[in-house]
C-alpha cells in the first residue's frame, strides 16, 4: 500500500508522515529530500524556487518509484509538494487501488489566527516561500492554489481549521478509517470475484483488516462512530462489526475450499 501525502507548505505533511510511520511501521520518502539530492549533486540546474519545473522533473521519477513499490508489494509513504493535481492519470486501476491519497491545506481563518505560530515553526530548508515573501497573504495564496487545483479535478482536500497537532491526531484517525475502508472494499470485490489472482492481490489487505479488527484502534474508531463523532460523509463499512466479521469469515472459507 502507498500513502501519498501532498499539500501546501507548513500544513504538517512531514509530521503526518512521521505519525503514520510510527503507527503503521511504513518507511517514507520525502520528495524534498529527493529534490535536494538531485540539485546538490548537480543532476539538474533547477533551483528550489523552480516549483512548476521541479514538479515536471520530479513527478515522473516519483510515480515510477511508486509503481515499483506496488509491483514488489512493498508499503511506502510518499510525502511532498511536487505532486500534480491530475496524478491519477498516470496510474492504471491496478495501481490506484493500492494508493491512498491525502491533500492538506489551511483555511484563511486558521492562517489569520495562527500565522505567528506557523512562522515560528517554518523550516528555512523546506519552505517554498522566501522569508521576505512569507506573509499571511502569500500563505493564503499557496493554500488556495492547492484547494482550488485539487478540488477542481475531483480530489478531496483535508482542511486544517484547528491547532496543528490536534488536527494531525484527528486526521490520522480519519485517514486510518478511510484507508481501512479502501482495503475493506478491495477485499469485498475480490471475494465476490473469487479468482485466484484477485484473492492473491488482497492477501495483505485481509491481513491488515484482521489486525485492525482485533486491535484497540478498531474499538476506539467503532466507539467514535457509535457516538456520532465521525464526519457524516465518511464511508465506514469497515466499522460495521457484522460487515468485517463476515468478510474475514468468507475469505477464510474460500481459502479452505481452494486448498
Predicted region positions:
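Hydrophobic anchor at the beta1->P-loop junction of P-loop NTPases
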Residues: 5
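Conserved substrate/cofactor phosphate-moiety recognition/catalytic segment
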Residues: 18-61
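Walker A/P-loop
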Residues: 14
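A glycine- and Lys/Arg-enriched "phosphate-lid" helix/loop adjacent to the NTP-binding pocket
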Residues: 99-143
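NTP-dependent small-molecule kinase module
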Residues: 144-175
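ATP-binding Walker
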Residues: 11
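P-loop (Walker A) phosphate-binding loop of NTP-binding proteins
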Residues: 8
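Glycine-rich phosphate-binding loop used to anchor ATP phosphates in small-molecule kinases
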Residues: 54-96
Amino acid at each position: 500500500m502507498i500513502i501519498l501525502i501532498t499539500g501546501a507548505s507548513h500544513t504538517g505533511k512531514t509530521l503526518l508522515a512521521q505519525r503514520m510511520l510510527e503507527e503503521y511501521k511504513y518507511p517514507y520518502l520525502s520528495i524534498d529530500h529527493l529534490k535536494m539530492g538531485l540539485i546538490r549533486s548537480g543532476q539538474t540546474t533547477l533551483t528550489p524556487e523552480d516549483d512548476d519545473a521541479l514538479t515536471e522533473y520530479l513527478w515522473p521519477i516519483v510515480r515510477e518509484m511508486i509503481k515499483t513499490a506496488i509491483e514488489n508489494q512493498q508499503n511506502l509513504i510518499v510525502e511532498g509538494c511536487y505532486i500534480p493535481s491530475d496524478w491519477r492519470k498516470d496510474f492504471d486501476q491496478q495501481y490506484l487501488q493500492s494508493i491512498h491519497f491525502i491533500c492538506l491545506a489551511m483555511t484563511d481563518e486558521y492562517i489569520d489566527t495562527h500565522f505567528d505560530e506557523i512562522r515560528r515553526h517554518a523550516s528555512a530548508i523546506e519552505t517554498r516561500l522566501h522569508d521576505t515573501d512569507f506573509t499571511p497573504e502569500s500563505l493564503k495564496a499557496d493554500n488556495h492554489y492547492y484547494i482550488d487545483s485539487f478540488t477542481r479535478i475531483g480530489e478531496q482536500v483535508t482542511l486544517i481549521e484547528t491547532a496543528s497537532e490536534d488536527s494531525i491526531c484527528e486526521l490520522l484517525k480519519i485517514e486510518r478509517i478511510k484507508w481501512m475502508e479502501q482495503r475493506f472494499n478491495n477485499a469485498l470485490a475480490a471475494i465476490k470475484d473469487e479468482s485466484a489472482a484477485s484473492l492473491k492481490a488482497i492477501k495483505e489487505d485481509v491481513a491488515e483488516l484482521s489486525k485492525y479488527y482485533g486491535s484497540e484502534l478498531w474499538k476506539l474508531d467503532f466507539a467514535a462512530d457509535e457516538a456520532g463523532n465521525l464526519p457524516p460523509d465518511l464511508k465506514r463499512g469497515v466499522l460495521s462489526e457484522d460487515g468485517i466479521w463476515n468478510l474475514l469469515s468468507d475469505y477464510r472459507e474460500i481459502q479452505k475450499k481452494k486448498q
